[in-house]
Amino acid sequence: MSLIDMIFGKRQKSAAIARERLQIILAHERNGRHAPDYLPALQRELMEVISKYVSVNLEDIKVQVERQDDYEVLEVNIVLPEHQR
Protein backbone atom coordinates (compact mmCIF):
# COMPACT_ATOMS: atom_id res chain seq x y z
CA MET A 1 0.00 0.00 0.00
CA SER A 2 1.58 3.28 -1.08
CA LEU A 3 1.50 6.56 0.82
CA ILE A 4 -0.88 8.11 -1.72
CA ASP A 5 -3.29 5.20 -1.36
CA MET A 6 -3.20 5.59 2.40
CA ILE A 7 -3.90 9.34 2.19
CA PHE A 8 -6.73 9.14 -0.33
CA GLY A 9 -8.42 6.16 1.25
CA LYS A 10 -7.79 3.27 -1.13
CA ARG A 11 -7.77 0.30 1.19
CA GLN A 12 -6.92 -3.33 0.84
CA LYS A 13 -9.50 -5.83 1.94
CA SER A 14 -8.90 -7.37 5.33
CA ALA A 15 -8.52 -10.86 3.82
CA ALA A 16 -5.67 -9.67 1.60
CA ILE A 17 -3.97 -7.99 4.55
CA ALA A 18 -4.37 -11.09 6.71
CA ARG A 19 -2.98 -13.33 3.96
CA GLU A 20 0.02 -11.03 3.50
CA ARG A 21 0.74 -11.00 7.23
CA LEU A 22 0.41 -14.78 7.46
CA GLN A 23 2.88 -15.22 4.60
CA ILE A 24 5.38 -13.00 6.40
CA ILE A 25 4.95 -14.93 9.65
CA LEU A 26 5.37 -18.28 7.89
CA ALA A 27 8.50 -17.09 6.11
CA HIS A 28 10.03 -15.96 9.41
CA GLU A 29 9.15 -19.25 11.11
CA ARG A 30 10.67 -21.30 8.29
CA ASN A 31 13.87 -19.28 8.36
CA GLY A 32 14.07 -19.23 12.14
CA ARG A 33 13.44 -22.90 12.66
CA HIS A 34 16.60 -24.43 14.07
CA ALA A 35 15.78 -28.09 14.35
CA PRO A 36 13.01 -30.08 12.71
CA ASP A 37 10.63 -31.99 14.96
CA TYR A 38 11.86 -35.37 13.74
CA LEU A 39 15.48 -34.96 14.92
CA PRO A 40 15.07 -36.51 18.41
CA ALA A 41 13.31 -39.56 16.94
CA LEU A 42 15.94 -39.85 14.21
CA GLN A 43 18.70 -39.68 16.81
CA ARG A 44 17.07 -42.46 18.89
CA GLU A 45 16.62 -44.69 15.85
CA LEU A 46 20.22 -44.14 14.77
CA MET A 47 21.30 -45.09 18.28
CA GLU A 48 19.33 -48.34 18.07
CA VAL A 49 20.86 -49.29 14.72
CA ILE A 50 24.42 -48.28 15.60
CA SER A 51 24.30 -50.02 18.98
CA LYS A 52 23.76 -53.34 17.17
CA TYR A 53 27.33 -53.04 15.89
CA VAL A 54 29.16 -50.64 18.23
CA SER A 55 28.67 -49.65 21.84
CA VAL A 56 28.00 -45.88 21.90
CA ASN A 57 26.11 -43.46 24.13
CA LEU A 58 23.24 -41.34 22.90
CA GLU A 59 25.33 -38.24 23.67
CA ASP A 60 27.95 -39.49 21.19
CA ILE A 61 25.52 -39.16 18.27
CA LYS A 62 24.89 -35.62 17.04
CA VAL A 63 22.29 -34.95 14.36
CA GLN A 64 21.98 -31.46 12.87
CA VAL A 65 20.18 -29.85 9.98
CA GLU A 66 21.92 -26.87 8.41
CA ARG A 67 20.79 -24.61 5.63
CA GLN A 68 23.30 -24.05 2.81
CA ASP A 69 22.05 -21.85 -0.02
CA ASP A 70 18.73 -23.39 -1.11
CA TYR A 71 19.38 -26.80 0.46
CA GLU A 72 19.00 -28.33 3.88
CA VAL A 73 21.91 -30.56 4.84
CA LEU A 74 21.50 -33.36 7.37
CA GLU A 75 24.76 -33.87 9.25
CA VAL A 76 25.33 -36.90 11.49
CA ASN A 77 28.44 -37.10 13.72
CA ILE A 78 29.15 -40.24 15.74
CA VAL A 79 31.99 -40.44 18.24
CA LEU A 80 33.21 -44.04 18.32
CA PRO A 81 35.01 -45.49 21.34
CA GLU A 82 38.79 -45.85 20.93
CA HIS A 83 38.85 -49.63 21.14
CA GLN A 84 36.21 -50.12 18.42
CA ARG A 85 37.60 -47.90 15.66
UniProtKB/Swiss-Prot annotation:
Keywords: Cell cycle, Cell division. Prevents the cell division inhibition by proteins MinC and MinD at internal division sites while permitting inhibition at polar sites. This ensures cell division at the proper site by restricting the formation of a division septum at the midpoint of the long axis of the cell. It comes from Chromobacterium violaceum (strain ATCC 12472 / DSM 30191 / JCM 1249 / CCUG 213 / NBRC 12614 / NCIMB 9131 / NCTC 9757 / MK). GO terms for biological process: cell division; regulation of division septum assembly. InterPro entries: MinE, MinE_sf. Belongs to the MinE family. The gene is minE. It comes from the Bacteria. This is Cell division topological specificity factor.
